[in-house]
Amino acid sequence: MAYTKIALFAAIAALASAQTQDQINELNVILNDVKSHLQEYISLASDSSSGFSLSSMPAGVLDIGMALASATDDSYTTLYSEVDFAGVSKMLTMVPWYSSRLEPALKSLNGDASSSAAPSSSAAPTSSAAPSSSAAPTSSAASSSSEAKSSSAAPSSSEAKSSSAAPSSSEAKSSSAAPSSSEAKSSSAAPSSTEAKITSAAPSSTGAKTSAISQITDGQIQATKAVSEQTENGAAKAFVGMGAGVVAAAAMLL
């Protein structure tokens, strides 16, 4: 809390004398270190071999440090106008604990100052145009939907043409032409009843063909039988005639 108050009042004093942020941070580091380690500064100033003396301390720093050690109010802030900020920058590197205490504290203050200033400068990303450019997915969705429509429409039209045209024409030709011409030729070319039976039975099943052939075979057998009977009857009649002639000749001879 005390360090915060020191930093606050140092900042006020620096602003009053138009000091830079780096000088304000250096003053804050010196004031806090003098307040916390006042005896070390007195001992260092008393050692002639250290190269550091009370006379070499920046104006106003020792007075403010001593006032802070026993301060009960903020009256010590009136001493800020007496601070030699150029001497403060030089004093930082003169003390033997600069690298162990002052430099880390100064870097810490510079880091806090840069981080506290960052939000004001980082307000620009909030106005980023990235969200507005995210409307692009709508255009990609539109293209995908149009592609889906075109891709789904094309197959249906081509399939409709192929399925409606080719089979109907080929079936009509095959069903109307071939059977009628073959049947007309077979029916008009049949000269006899036997051939008519054969041609009429041809388009039927295998059983019909077999029955027609058997009928033809039976007719041939009957014809052969009739011829053989006629032959046998003729031979018998001829033999009987020949016998009668022989008997008549014998009678005449007697």
Swiss-Prot record:
The keyword Signal applies. Keywords: Cell wall, Glycoprotein, GPI-anchor, Lipoprotein, Membrane, Repeat, Secreted, Signal, Stress response. Sequence repeats lie at residues 114-119, 120-125, 126-131, 132-137, 138-143, 144-155, 156-167, 168-179, 180-191, 192-203. This is Cold shock-induced protein TIR1. O-glycosylated. The GPI-anchor is attached to the protein in the endoplasmic reticulum and serves to target the protein to the cell surface. There, the glucosamine-inositol phospholipid moiety is cleaved off and the GPI-modified mannoprotein is covalently attached via its lipidless GPI glycan remnant to the 1,6-beta-glucan of the outer cell wall layer. Residues 201-213 have a biased composition (Polar residues). Present with 623 molecules/cell in log phase SD medium. GO terms for cellular component: cell periphery; extracellular region; fungal-type cell wall; fungal-type vacuole; side of membrane. PANTHER family: CELL WALL PROTEIN CWP1-RELATED, SERIPAUPERIN. The gene is TIR1. Residues 234-254 form a propeptide.
